[in-house]
């Protein structure tokens, strides 16, 4: 798949999640409308083996970049690339909004995901609970208080028996 077409395909579902990021900062939804002045302008592309993303609002802009994940299985590679590009776009917009407003949300740039899932993923890659919480906190700009809450929740969950294949989880209340 050509770089430009792959990037366009990967970005098809990210628009609503970008709006979630601006909601963290209580920004006017009209900033996404081209008829509103100023309005968000953004562009994502591939170059030099990396994903790039740029957001601008008025005279302020922010650029981000990340590596393009590779995998031998093309289907898994496409999913990982979509995830990486979406994360890059959300983080780049988050950084711009944080600079524009001076606000730092307690959960940082996390939207639409259970934070414990990210901790478990990091632990599956060999990190300790402390290191995993620190990594999630650094990557997503999570406050120290919320990092501690993450650590406490994962610690409590680790005492519970793992689910069997024929069982499912039911969330009654999520403390996030």
Residue ranges, per PLM feature:
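Short, charged N-terminal beta->alpha structural module
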Residues: 1-28, 143
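Short, well-ordered secondary-structure micro-motifs within conserved domains or adaptor modules
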Residues: 2, 22-81, 86-89
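Generic structural signal for hydrophobic residues
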Residues: 18-22, 93, 132
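Short gly/ser-rich anion-binding loops that grip negatively charged ligand groups
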Residues: 79, 83, 87, 109, ...
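Conserved, surface-exposed functional patches that form binding/active-site neighborhoods
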Residues: 85-105
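N-terminal [4Fe-4S]-dependent radical SAM core
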Residues: 97-104, 124-171
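Local cysteine-cluster metal-coordination motifs and their immediate loop/turn environment
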Residues: 109, 114, 171-176
